[in-house]
Amino acid sequence: MAPSRLQLGLRAAYSGFSSVAGFSIFFVWTVVYRQPGTAAMGGLAGVLALWVLVTHVMYMQDYWRTWLRGLRGFFFVGALFSAVSVSAFCTFLALAITQHQSLKDPNSYYLSCVWSFISFKWAFLLSLYAHRYRADFADISILSDF
């Protein structure tokens, strides 16, 4: 079932806001706190949110109808970065526990765990929307063949 224009607009707005938030986390944790783990995962979350935004905009413009192979690529990219985000989450959690870091410290690896989870969320949403939009357009292309 195709999403309504309102749903697409809300999804696009949320993705756009989250991409700005991810990029701002990248710059703040790179320049101010000098914590590369949190900066990298915040930047990855911003890039993935931007990718989800592009997916929604291309769906609204009906671009995917002619390029279903691109949606398959988006699906696999989302799956790849889901695995990367989960492994980063486990790594940062293990580092934070073994180094006995504080939950309140902005330089701790616990904050990197949070942004790893947010990156996982956006990678999962990229795969989910690519799968749904591909299924939606695949149904339409099957009907147009007859």
UniProtKB/Swiss-Prot annotation:
BP GO terms, sorted: erythrocyte differentiation; heme export; heme export from vacuole to cytoplasm; heme metabolic process; localization of cell; lysosomal transport; phagocytosis
Tissue: Strongly expressed in macrophages of the reticuloendothelial system.
Intervals of motif Di-leucine motif: 142-143
Family: Belongs to the HRG family.
Effect of disrupting the coding gene: Deficient mice fed the standard laboratory rodent diet have peripheral blood counts that are all within the normal range, including the red cell indices. No differences between male and female animals. They show 15% increase in the size of the spleen in. Mutants have hemozoin beginning to accumulate in reticuloendothelial system macrophages 8 days after birth. They require more dietary iron to maintain erythropoiesis than littermate control animals.
Gene name tied to this protein: Slc48a1
Molecular functions (GO terms): heme binding; heme transmembrane transporter activity
Protein's name in the database: Heme transporter HRG1
